Amino acid sequence: MPFFVNVKISKSVFRSFRLSFSSFQDFSVFFFNSFNCLHSMLKFVNLDSKSQFKSLVESNSFMKDFFWLVSSSILSLNDSLICLRDLICSFLASLEDCNFLHSTNKFSLSSKVKFISFDEFAVSTPLWELLPANSGSTSFVSLLLKILEIENRFVLSPSSPLPHSSAFKLAILVTPFVETLSWLNELSMLFAYCPAELSLSLFFLCLLLWDIFERLVESLDRCVFTRLYSTLWSY
């Protein structure tokens, strides 16, 4: 079964690898060959033995270069997402200034919405220690719930007839994909046994995406357009 990957590379990411690859074609060949190699390893490597996988990665210079590439790409993506997060914050602040939010449920960005500080999570805990011991289709969801436990944000709003938190909405969006797409589960298990450097970069990426998603959900829940949509939906 072929393994297709759609890749979008920003200019900042490409500049960081310009010295390592003579041309973009060489970079793309290396990237897609790496994913094909990963897909093949999913079939032959026993994922129940993480020591076997780690030793295989450490002994293979090609795989070590690949994991360095992925880690650097994620860190570059984090920088882009931080800029996006600041842009979202400015947009929400402009909504407050224009009174687009509920007058009764108006919230303060500085008091109720907190940026994630990576310093609080700069620990040497590998990602596989956060995952449950048993493997299954819920491993990815369990990882998200573990992040929620660390962030202490899994709180349902008692004033809403339905669960109001972004955690509930994210679970609704993610769970069907995790249960139906087997390759996503395999890929999440594969990254769970990656070296600690890559695991931490993936973990920080999840936290940053979570921060952006939570901001959007909290703003939309209090936005007048959502109120109008709810009124029309009731009819």
UniProtKB/Swiss-Prot annotation:
Q: What happens when the gene is disrupted?
A: Cannot grow under anaerobic growth conditions.
Which domain of life does this protein belong to? Answer: Eukaryota
Q: How does it sit in the membrane?
A: Multi-pass membrane protein
Cysteine pairs forming cystine bridges in this chain are none
GO-annotated cellular components: membrane
Keyword Transmembrane helix on this protein?
Answer: yes
Identify the keywords attached in UniProt to this record, alphabetized.
Membrane, Transmembrane, Transmembrane helix
Asked if the Swiss-Prot or TrEMBL record annotates the protein with the keyword Protein biosynthesis, the reply is no
The UniProt entry lists the main location of this chain as: membrane
Instruction: Give the transmembrane ranges.
Output: 167-187, 190-210
Where it sits in the cell: the answer is: Membrane
Note the coiled coil stretches, chain numbering. none
Q: Tell me more from the record.
A: Partially overlaps NUM1. Disruption phenotypes caused by deletion of this gene may also be a result of a defect in its overlapping gene.
The identity of this protein, by name, is: Putative uncharacterized membrane protein YDR149C
Gene source species: Saccharomyces cerevisiae (strain ATCC 204508 / S288c)
